Amino acid sequence: KEKLLEKASYLKGVYIPRFSKPIYNDDGKILKYESFQNLPIKKEINNNFYQKPIFSPIISPLSFFSNMVLLEGGRGCMYNCRFCLSGHFYKPYRKTDLSIAIKEINKLFTSNKKIGLILPSIDKSISWDEIKEFLKENEILISFSSLRLDQLDDNILEILNKSKQKTLTIAPETGSDRLRKFLNKNFSNKDIIEFVYKIKNLSISNLKLYFMYGLPTEDFNDIKSIVELIKEIRSILKTQISISLSCFIPKPHTPFQWEKMEREEYFIKKQEYIRREIFKIENVELQKESIELSILQGIISRGDRRLSKIWKMNKPLKRLIKNLIEEKNFYIFRERERDEFFPWDIIDIGINKEYLWNEREKAYNERGL
């Protein structure tokens, strides 16, 4: 095993943790790494993504997505939401040639031709007019994992209507235009309402909305704006509305990797307010992410190898979180210093750390606009 790992360590894009040793300062922060490998390890990128579509070769009526071919429509994202790990970690953005992919799937599957398109956002450069005609001719149904408001043109509306997709998903993230701008999500509540009017007459039975709370610079007016936006959508759309409410968790390799996370008391109080207000709105379902699980995820997502002891603690989640006082204070409840060495800095994903810091600064400088 040791020889195999040693040989693997010379391969591009391979990081072997046991060959690197972190050196810590007295305050517990990482000073540097001593390593047998040349750090940082540069991430390898699949540049042949366009011509070689990736999709599930087997479909089954027993799978979660019953009788559906799942097609990876793109990797990474053309947008730069400042909180999003996927959009930064999987840069550069690469798209599948959907025309090639759909034609290939059409040859392989002769019946139940349903395609689930997995991608964080739809590329505006895709020729949906041509794809729409091919889908129609070959009786292929296609559904989208999520949509951005500015991507909903007439072709996609028609595809959605014919696919009989029952659930449509969008991510406003917040009800506040100011806070959305801070996140670099460049659409407004007005755009959201226009989107709702566009989908009003589609055959969908459920609109799913993703929101976060505990965001940097957030105040109580931002929390109230979530409820107000849901109320406005409810007044237009008579179908079921599902709300997914998540705690903001700062992620590595993003402009918000320096941010602190709010304490449990904050999340409990704000979650209860949102739950109470949404309960008053007819036909709206609230799905709340566990606060304890979010706190644990926050610790692990920006933690280091010293957290391995957590896996050895055989305790219920609530008791575990209660006992991790030092870990919470060190890993999530403090704002990181600009020049702090992060555990993940030994992996080069192709984005300059200075760029991420400047994006964070830009967010704070623009917040009053």
What do the predicted segments below correspond to?
Residues 1-34, 255-304, 312-314:
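Glycine-rich beta-alpha loop elements in corrinoid/cobalamin-binding modules
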Residues 66-70, 82-91, 112-118, 175-182, ...:
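Glycine- and acidic
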Residues 277-369:
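Radical SAM enzyme core and accessory elements
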